[in-house]
């Protein structure tokens, strides 16, 4: 038995590399190993399986799948398939998703018995009942690569109960990744749902009760689910994509640290007031959790001391002062520490004549600090007035999703240039609060960046991947230039 380890998300190129298949899939030769084995391939030298030709190259000829044994109840395991190559040799193909094993066996005695039983099965009049037979037996139209991809897709659907989506269609797998969506259409966990798939002309019905939260929790180390289209993004590459959904282009939330890394040149970030923490000024107590305990919990969870990071750095060589709010820390709520850190940042920039960027992501004033949190609105606005009106310096406000409450009512809307991210939720009061207060229905989409842009609420809507270049041009337009010309990108 020869075993190949494989990942549950495969492209054709990855499959070809792992199994010794070449890109020339029009004609496949005898199944076997490539002459140069990888470390992750386990070779059983006792098996006499043909190599890829005399030269050790990967040139191929046709492989004919005999049947998928799902059509024969109880014959062999549901994840085993029988194929035949151009030399007439038969092989059984076995998939084990849980243990990530791909096995090929050419035990002739076993396979002869298997084929004999299969022939008997077919002669008993079951040809028409077996959906795999009519389409695949001795049919060179479907290549080995297409067949294996379809088998993996069908196995993924049934084994781990996910809805697979093949980008290039159900009949042509030659250029497609197998993208797996865990409950891609949001299904109520209390309802019984059915997935209906077409497998080579037959309908495969899978019924079960799905629990979205359990599934997301199970696979969250691999995937990030889009809030807009519910598609899955591979977590390993998600950060390099700037947290933008590959399926629909939706901008998902980013941590403050990721935003700093996105905007600030490498090695130039110098944080300010990192040791400043809240002391629970009004001794707010909740039946559920003490305010201090909640602060400590978020500090451990996020690695931050408060809901904003402030500091100085360079953006394409231009010295700037920047504050970035983090929605992951108590919803980015603005308390006395957040207000103090932003005020000190603006005052520092005023004294050094630096441009200021503040990235807003907040639910508003922090209720656990009462009127002290509301006071921060006036304090920051006062510092901003001196910076902008008296010193004539340049302040850019960037509104991300969500920006609401006291932040919207103060420094969020005070920028000389106000930039919004696509699809950002921007409001003073939330939809539910407005509807309950005024007894009026708030239209869907009336608090999104695109709608508010047409109402003149801010200046441009800038996608994340273009933001750094736009900011650099704005600063140079307003007289802030790189420390050296080589820094311009």
Swiss-Prot record:
Gene Ontology annotations for the cellular component aspect, listed alphabetically: acetyl-CoA carboxylase complex; chloroplast stroma
Localization per record: Plastid, Chloroplast stroma
Example of a GO MF term: acetyl-CoA carboxylase activity
Keyword field: ATP-binding, Chloroplast, Fatty acid biosynthesis, Fatty acid metabolism, Lipid biosynthesis, Lipid metabolism, Metal-binding, Nucleotide-binding, Plastid, Transferase, Zinc, Zinc-finger
PROSITE patterns: COA_CT_NTER
Swiss-Prot/TrEMBL catalytic activity: N(6)-carboxybiotinyl-L-lysyl-[protein] + acetyl-CoA = N(6)-biotinyl-L-lysyl-[protein] + malonyl-CoA
Pathway: Lipid metabolism; malonyl-CoA biosynthesis; malonyl-CoA from acetyl-CoA: step 1/1
NCBIfam families referenced in this protein's UniProt entry, alphabetically: accD (TIGR00515)
Subunit structure: Acetyl-CoA carboxylase is a heterohexamer composed of biotin carboxyl carrier protein, biotin carboxylase and 2 subunits each of ACCase subunit alpha and ACCase plastid-coded subunit beta (accD).
Protein name, entry field: Acetyl-coenzyme A carboxylase carboxyl transferase subunit beta, chloroplastic
Organism: Buxus microphylla
